[in-house]
Amino acid sequence: MRPTARQFTLPDLFSICPLQDATNPWYKQAAAESRAWINSYNIFTDRKRAFFIQGSNELLCSHVYAYAGYEQFRTCCDFVNLLFVVDEISDDQNGQDARATGRIFVNAMRDAHWDDGSILAKITHEFRERFVRLAGPKTVRRFADLCESYTDCVAREAELRERNQVLGLNDFIALRRQNSAVLLCYSLVEYILGIDLDDEVYEDPTFAKAYWAACDFVCWANDVYSYDMEQAKGHTGNNVVTVLMKEKDLSLQEASDYIGRECEKQMRDYLEAKSQLLQSTDLPQEAVRYIEALGYWMVGNLVWSFESQRYFGAQHERVKATHVVHLRPSSVLEASCDSDSDSDC
């Protein structure tokens, strides 16, 4: 892996994305209610940071679930806030403790009567009650399975961090698909649309091509956008930028360029597979609606990444215009956490 430069140019992912962005009309009302719900538990030690990240995540929901009705959108906001609780609890835990936290989350998600008396179990039960009211049985089962895969992979990420180990690319892709929570968020699409797909639909080659392309596009875009924030915190091991630099002996700029080419291929695969599904009679129309809805995630995530200050802080408009990222030293990021700005910390 070559020495890291102090700046790099992001790939222009908007230029390869023909999908149209939109926002949810229920955003302000539902986001405020969801935020009040999670804050009523008083579990965040840094309220300013919690408020910003929650608001930022709810803004993301507005883009990626633009088509959701009020109740469904509110439930989606609740879920991203629940994930924030899980992350907040497990962020500084070792692998063993992170697995224990994950088990609480999964057990409460699978069983409405399971209770260890923890706040996490109570919050999870309250989300689950809203979710299962409208979700189909197959969707509920898959969602619980994905919750378990997510927490297992988050714990594995913690173990890799303890060992200062960076995975090879193929192993990393498999891990990143799960610990990013993108698949969990995609599972909410069935709930929103009021559909309950058979497991066989996910095994269809054309459906799977679109599904995994949409997942990888979001994961890889997030990694290149978040790299500066993560390197300033000293947490770069769970990022495809680092994986590419190490495995392929690339510079930071070369890794960014590589990601741009891969994202272009992922977008092309998604669009081609979606077009084939539209012309096919092999799968139910609900499967096509599901794949089309994933497009909101692909474009909405791009728009949100520069609309919010999550990754680039107060420089987000400049970075959007120039694509140039100046790497921040850790002291600068720490100072921004203590300032009055809305920079992510």
Swiss-Prot record:
Domain of life from the UniProt record: Eukaryota
Cofactor(s) this protein requires: Mg(2+)
Annotated catalysed reactions: (2E,6E)-farnesyl diphosphate + H2O = cubebol + diphosphate; (2E,6E)-farnesyl diphosphate = beta-copaene + diphosphate; (2E,6E)-farnesyl diphosphate = beta-cubebene + diphosphate; (2E,6E)-farnesyl diphosphate = (+)-sativene + diphosphate
Note accompanying the cofactor annotation: Binds 3 Mg(2+) ions per subunit.
Sites where the protein binds Mg(2+) 2: D87, D91
Residues holding Mg(2+) 1: D87, D91
UniProt similarity note: Belongs to the terpene synthase family.
GO biological process: isoprenoid biosynthetic process
Pfam families: Terpene_syn_C_2
Organism (species): Coprinopsis cinerea (strain Okayama-7 / 130 / ATCC MYA-4618 / FGSC 9003)
Name of this protein: Linoleate 10R-lipoxygenase COP4
Keyword Metal-binding: yes
EC number: 4.2.3.91, 4.2.3.129, 4.2.3.127, 4.2.3.128
Alphabetical UniProt keywords: Lyase, Magnesium, Metal-binding
Keyword tRNA processing: no
Spans traversing the lipid bilayer: none
Molecular function via GO: metal ion binding; terpene synthase activity
InterPro entries, per the entry: Isoprenoid_synthase_dom_sf (IPR008949), Terpene_cyclase-like_2 (IPR034686)
Gene it is expressed from: COP4
Binding, Mg(2+) 3: N222, S226, E230
Reported function: Sesquiterpene synthase that catalyzes the cyclization of farnesyl diphosphate (FPP) into multiple products, including germacrene D, beta-copaene, beta-cubebene, (+)-sativene and cubebol, a natural sesquiterpene alcohol used in the food industry for its cooling and refreshing taste. Terpenoid hydrocarbons resulting from cyclization of farnesyl diphosphate are intermediates in the biosynthesis of biologically active compounds such as antibiotics, toxins and pheromones.
Motif (DDXXD motif): 87-91
Entry domain remark: The Asp-Asp-Xaa-Xaa-Asp/Glu (DDXXD/E) motif is important for the catalytic activity, presumably through binding to Mg(2+).
